[in-house]
Amino acid sequence: TALQLNKYTVSSERLPRAFDGCKIAHISDLHNTEIGKNNETLLNMLREAKPDIIAITGDLIDSRKTDVAAALHFAGEAVKIAPCYYVTGNHEARTSEYDALKTGLIKLGVTVLENEKTEVERAGEKITLIGVKDPSFSSDYLFHDEEAIMESQLKALVDKDDGFTLLLSHRPELFDVYVTCNADLVLSGHAHGGQFRL
């Protein structure tokens, strides 16, 4: 499995000065893949990047070959590098082992966000981090469209007074919904290589 590090610089007048230079490592869709034995290649890349935050946006496990222990090993090492924030993907919704994964992540110190928000503080200033559960967890998933489910989830979380807001959600195709919630930055996965391919 090839591993590539992409670096992006995000600028916003809404970002508190204390977050200038803040590094976020974004990991998504590992699907229980090991990049190097016990994910050491990936973990070494994370260590070298020295992130301030690690965002994991779903599909840490694969519903066809779920290995909770491998996922927890990766998360346990990642949380030693930087605070980790995790949201679910569609593969977590498809397995009966999600509760074991969630419990293990929490025990390791990973912040699991299921339609919740939290604050990240740095030098006395704060940003809001919102994490939404994948729509496929909803009991209405078969009867309602994903946009309606996501809109409902976000409506309860969004507050225009929250300041700079970072949204973690597995699904990039719901970006039109995210725009309406005033998120300043959205991190998502699911697309395995991008929304646009040439």
Task: Report each predicted region and the residues it spans.
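Alpha-helical membrane-targeting segments
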Residues: F196-L198
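N-terminal membrane-anchoring alpha-helices
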Residues: T1-A18
